[in-house]
A protein has these predicted regions:
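ATP-binding N-terminal substructure of ATP-dependent carboxylate-amine bond-forming enzymes
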Residues: 1-105, 373-376, 380-386
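A short glycine-rich, hydrophobically flanked beta-strand micro-motif that places a catalytic Asp/Glu
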Residues: 257-269
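Peripheral (often C-terminal) accessory segments that flank ATP-dependent C-N-forming ligase machineries
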Residues: 4, 303-388
Length: 388
C-alpha cells in the first residue's frame, strides 16, 4: 500500500505514526518543508522516499510532489497528516487524485463548527446553541435569546485562539472591533458552565469503535490562552457511560470510519448533562496520544497503523492509570524548582520537556506527564507542580 504522509517531521509524534506504518508493510512516502538531513533517524528509517517543498502552503508544489510519487510508485492509497491544520489540504489532494478518505464534499462538516451542529442534532445529543455571525443586529437578537455571557470563536479551526467570553454589549463591540474578527468567519455560542470531557479513540472500516478513551479538562482552555495561564488535564482510565453513549451517537451521525476521533463535550455543572461542543476527526493534540498509551498500557500509534493496513486483529486494552499533564509558564514564579519536583515525585513522572513555541500559549512553556492509580493522587501532583 502506498501511503503519503504530509508533514511527517512536525509535530514530533508524527514519527511514531510513520514508524508503525512502515513496520506493518506500507510503502511510506513523505512530503515536508524540512531538509532531509534534519529528520530524525527513526523517521528516515520509516520513509521510502521524501520530497521536500519550500512552502507547504503552496498547493502547486504539493500537487507536483504527489504527481511525482504517483508517476513513480503508482496510485496513492492514503494521504494523511493527522493534523487539524492540514485537513482541508488533505481533502483537496484526495479529491484531485481520487484517494480514499474525506474529500472536498464533506470536509467543511468536520472543520466548521456551524456545520457540525446539524450532525449533533442528528445524533440526538444536546449541543451548544450557536449563531454564525452576519451582522450586529442579528447577533444581538441571538444573545437576547440565550443571554450573556456568550463565547465568540472562529467558525473553522481548533484550540482557543481568537476565542472570547463576552459578558455585555460593551465587550461585544470591543471584540468586534478586532480586525482579525472582521476578516474572518466566526460564530457566537451560548456559554456553558462546565468541564470538558473528551471521547477519543479509533473507529475501524466498519464503524466499530476498537479503542476508546476520555480526557478531563477542569479549566477553560479559552481562559488559559487569554490569561496566559498554565494548563493541566487528566487522561482517565475509564470512559463514563454517558460520554460513551454520546460519543458513539455522534460517530454514527457523522458515519466515521477508519479514523482517529477526538470529540469534545461539556459536562454541565448545574445538572451533569452532556452537551456536544465540537468534533475532530484526528488524534487529540499535544501529548495526549502518549497519555492514552500510559493510561491503558497500549500503543495507539501502532494500533492506528494496524487498523489502516488491516495487518492483524486489534489488540484490546484496559485502562489502569490516571495520566496527568501539568504545564508551567516562564512568566510565573513557582514554589518548587524542577530539581525539587524530580526529587519529590520523580518516580511518578513519565516524561518532561519544553514545549514547541507554536503550542506554548495553550500548552505551557514546560510540562510534566505522570501517572498514578487514583484521581486524588494525580491532582496532588498537579497542585505540587503548579503551586506558586
Amino acid at each position: 500500500m502506498n501511503i503519503l504522509f504530509f508533514s511527517p517531521h512536525f509535530p514530533q509524534n508524527s514519527t511514531e505514526f510513520c514508524f508503525y506504518l512502515k513496520e506493518y508493510g506500507a510503502n511510506l512516502l513523505g512530503i515536508g518543508d524540512a531538509e532531509y538531513s534534519s529528520l530524525n533517524d527513526r523517521l528516515k528509517h520509516s520513509l521510502s522516499e521524501y520530497y521536500r517543498v519550500s512552502n507547504m502552503e503552496d498547493y502547486d508544489q504539493i500537487l507536483r510532489a504527489v504527481g511525482f510519487f504517483t508517476h513513480k510508485y503508482g496510485k496513492i492509497d492514503r494521504f494523511e497528516s493527522l493534523n487539524e491544520y492540514w485537513l482541508e489540504l488533505e481533502a483537496q489532494i484526495r479529491t484531485d487524485f481520487n484517494i480514499s478518505g474525506t474529500k472536498n464534499d464533506f470536509i467543511q462538516n468536520l472543520k466548521r463548527k456551524s456545520k457540525m451542529k446539524s450532525f449533533f442534532e442528528k445524533s440526538g445529543v444536546q449541543t451548544v446553541k450557536c449563531y454564525k455571525y452576519t451582522d450586529r443586529e442579528s447577533a444581538l437578537k441571538f444573545i437576547e435569546e440565550v443571554g450573556y455571557p456568550v463565547v465568540v470563536k472562529p467558525d473553522s479551526g481548533s484550540g482557543a485562539n481568537f476565542t472570547y467570553k463576552i459578558k455585555n454589549e460593551f465587550e461585544f463591540d470591543n471584540v468586534f472591533a478586532n480586525k482579525h474578527l472582521q476578516d474572518a468567519e466566526f460564530i457566537i455560542e451560548e456559554f456553558v458552565d462546565g468541564i470538558i470531557l473528551t471521547y477519543d479513540g479509533l473507529v475501524d472500516l466498519y464503524g466499530n469503535v476498537i479503542f476508546e478513551n476520555s480526557h478531563r479538562f477542569e479549566q477553560s482552555i479559552m481562559n488559559v490562552v487569554n490569561n496566559d495561564d498554565h494548563l493541566y488535564y487528566i487522561c482517565l482510565p475509564e470512559v463514563a457511560e454517558k460520554v460513551r453513549l454520546a460519543g458513539r451517537s455522534v460517530l454514527k451521525a457523522f458515519d466515521v470510519r477508519e479514523k482517529f476521533f477526538h470529540i469534545e463535550f461539556f459536562e454541565r455543572k448545574r445538572d451533569g448533562k452532556i452537551v456536544a461542543l465540537e468534533v475532530n476527526m484526528r488524534p487529540p493534540g499535544a501529548w495526549m496520544p502518549d497519555a492514552m498509551n500510559y493510561a491503558h498500557d497500549t500503543n495507539v500509534y501502532k494500533r492506528w497503523a494496524n487498523m489502516v493496513l488491516q495487518y492483524q486483529p486489534d489488540e484490546a486494552s484496559t485502562g489502569r492509570y490516571f495520566t496527568g499533564y501539568a504545564a508551567r509558564k516562564n512568566h510565573k514564579k513557582y514554589k518548587y524548582s524542577h530539581e525539587e519536583i524530580l526529587n519529590e515525585i520523580g518516580d511518578k513522572i513519565l516524561y518532561c520537556s519544553s514545549i514547541e513555541k507554536v503550542f506554548s500559549r495553550a500548552m505551557g512553556d514546560f510540562a510534566y506527564q505522570f501517572r498514578t492509580e487514583t484521581y486524588e493522587e494525580v491532582k496532588k501532583i498537579i497542585d505540587y507542580i503548579q503551586k506558586e
